[in-house]
Amino acid sequence: MHNKQLLLAHRGYSFIAPENTKLAFDLAFEYCFDGIELDVHLTKDEQLVIIHDETTLRTALVNKEVEFESLVSLKRDDHSAFFHLKIQFQSILTLKEFLDLYLDKFKLINIEIKTDQKPYLGIEKKLVDLVKGYGKKAIDKILFSSFNFESLQKVYDLDNSYKKGFLFWTKKQFETISTARIQKICQFLHPWTKIYEKYPQMIKKLNLPLNLWTVNSQNKFQQFLADNHVYAQIANKKFEIKIN
């Protein structure tokens, strides 16, 4: 489907740095990943912040629910606290801080809208309003994904300029949304690697390029590299093409 698959750093270079932090994103650039996959939630004061979970407990070791905290409150905590090595303090980033720093550095930025557990009312409009400020560059480089198809529908309704990918990790999730609707709204599918390997024909029949997550071994990387349905592989580690 294209000449060169992309390799996206899953929450930044999260194998060697704390996920979704500036350090992880800096290292993804230094190690020449093609792009970044990251997760976005909405704070009490309606700031778009980059974190995977709905709470800060796992990463900052302080139990705060993102939707009930202000940005100032969340900025106080060190999101490298969970990491197995001592490193410099890593403050939670806003999406704007990230885009200002990294939009120019990567080919593709995959923003996962984390509305599968909490609705975060209005998050889609805030996302579209923010990325519009970056003009054509954002249209070229930004891809929104979500397990919640309604969030992708909302982005489509607000502004259909931006790429969208449907995330799923079960057959049931995939079959809940009609093929026609997926093909209308989305330019990509984002299946879990194991579900893709189990039901390849079911997924390929939509004829949409695939962004696979999460690729964890060199062998799998090489295997998917030979699959012309795959547009990008999303991985915690950096893999290189090996020529036998």
UniProtKB/Swiss-Prot annotation:
It comes from Mycoplasma genitalium (strain ATCC 33530 / DSM 19775 / NCTC 10195 / G37) (Mycoplasmoides genitalium). Transmembrane segments: none annotated. Pfam families: GDPD. PANTHER family: GLYCEROPHOSPHODIESTER PHOSPHODIESTERASE, CYTOPLASMIC, GLYCEROPHOSPHORYL DIESTER PHOSPHODIESTERASE. It comes from the Bacteria. One of its GO terms (biological process) is lipid metabolic process. This is Uncharacterized protein MG293. Coiled coil: none annotated.
